Each structure stands twice: as C-alpha cells, then as structure tokens.
C-alpha cells in the first residue's frame, strides 16, 4: 500500500491475483509492453506506475492482454512467499528439473520481470511443458499440484472465431489452443510450447519471427 496514490481508482483495490493471472485486471489497455518498460526511459518503479493508472473496467469482467498484469502478479507472489520470483522458482521448479538458473530480465527495482524476458533453451521449454503434461509430476515427484495444472489450463475467457489458433481462449497465463484439451505458453517472437494432453505430446519451437505469426502457425 506504500505505492498507492493518495486517491486511488476505486477498482484498483478490487484487483485479485486471479484477475492478473487471466489478464482481466480492468486496466483496459496494454501496459509495460512498450516504451513504458524500455530501460532508461520507461517507468522507474513499475508498481507505483501501475497504481496510478485508471482502472475503468470491473476487475474480472473483461480480457485485455497486458504484460503489466503478469508483472503485478509476480510482485504479489513475491510478497506472499517472502522471496524474489527467481529464487522461488529456482527452488520449487527449475532446480528439480535440472534447469539451472535462467537468464531473466529485471525491472528497475530489481524484481525479475514477471511479464517476460526469461531466456530458455528449447530443451528447457520442453521440460516445463512435460511437467504440465504429467500433471505437475517430474520423475515421481509432485513439483506442481495437479489442481493447479487443471486450473491454469481451464479457459477463463473464450473468444471468436474459435478456429483461430491465437484467439481461442485464455486460462491462467496460458493460451488455450484449438486442439481438444490443449493449451500453450507463448513467448515473444515465436517462442512457443504447446501441451496436448490427449495426444500425450509436448511441442516446443523457437523462432525469430517478429510480425508474421502465420509463419509460426
């Protein structure tokens, strides 16, 4: 609350973690995705910057893709666990998967960027996909709860046309794919991991595509 302005938007205090995870915070526009996140010229304090934004839409009522939602969600988790996201994920996920500590961009306050900037090899992307394909189990150890895997892959919003690979639906930080039961993690410029539970399959690709996503499809 030390980052709140003196007269915050009434909807701001209604935002919950679940709203941030499914891109329904209510900010109604993409934030911390362009110049406002550019090193040296962007917002010097992401939390303070976001707390000052208007929230014209009721949280949870409408989808609007924005890196700011993921960034704020990561900050919320950090407060809950008392650790930076990099440390927490390394302990709970990356180390058990023998992934090491990934290169990850940080914001001006030193927080790992919850909205992107994590550099992984294709093999590491496949490992994370395999973890979710196995309902959170890795070599007999339950790394992530089955309930959470089910929750993140359940659509919170669905879109038309349903045949469009990029606009089928959205769960918790995962896009819903058109194949039955499938969902995927998308990274910038065509870094994609798709989990297809009914096929027992994970597909990961890395691609330097910057605009024509039909080529990625």
Features from the language model and the residues they span:
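Structural recognition of the beta-strand scaffold that forms the well-ordered cores
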Residues: 16-22, 64, 101-104, 119, ...
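Active-site Gly/Thr loop motif
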Residues: 99-101, 149-202
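Alpha-helical scaffold elements that line and support the substrate/ligand-binding pocket
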Residues: 20, 63-93, 125-131, 200-203
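Structural helix-adjacent loops and short alpha-helical linkers that scaffold large soluble proteins
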Residues: 32, 39, 78-90, 136-144
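A short acidic/small-residue loop/turn micro-motif
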Residues: 209-211
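Active-site-proximal binding-pocket segments
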Residues: 95-152
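Active-site helix/loop module of the DD-peptidase/beta-lactamase fold
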Residues: 1-27, 52-54, 81-116, 120
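Short, gly/Ser/Thr-rich active-site loops of penicillin-recognizing serine hydrolases
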Residues: 213-217
């Amino acid at each position: 609350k030390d980052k709140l302005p003196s007269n915050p938007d009434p909807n701001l205090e209604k935002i919950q973690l679940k709203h941030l995870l499914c891109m329904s915070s209510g900010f109604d526009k993409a934030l911390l995705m362009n110049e406002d996140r550019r090193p040296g010229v962007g917002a010097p304090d992401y939390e303070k910057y976001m707390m000052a934004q208007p929230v014209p839409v009721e949280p949870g009522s409408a989808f609007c893709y924005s890196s700011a939602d993921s960034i704020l969600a990561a900050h919320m988790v950090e407060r809950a666990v008392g650790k930076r996201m990099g440390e927490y994920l390394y302990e709970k996920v990356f180390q058990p998967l023998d992934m090491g500590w990934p290169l990850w961009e940080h914001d001006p306050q030193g927080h790992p960027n919850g909205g992107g900037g994590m550099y992984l090899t294709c093999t590491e992307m496949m490992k994370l996909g395999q973890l979710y394909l196995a309902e959170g189990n890795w070599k007999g150890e339950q790394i992530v709860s089955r309930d959470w895997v089910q929750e993140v892959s359940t659509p919170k919003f669905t879109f038309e046309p349903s045949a469009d690979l990029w606009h089928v639906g959205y769960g918790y930080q995962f896009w819903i794919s058109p194949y039955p039961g499938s969902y995927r993690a998308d990274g910038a410029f065509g870094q994609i991991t798709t989990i297809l539970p009914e096929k027992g399959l994970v597909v990961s690709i890395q691609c330097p595509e910057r605009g024509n996503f039909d080529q990625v499809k």
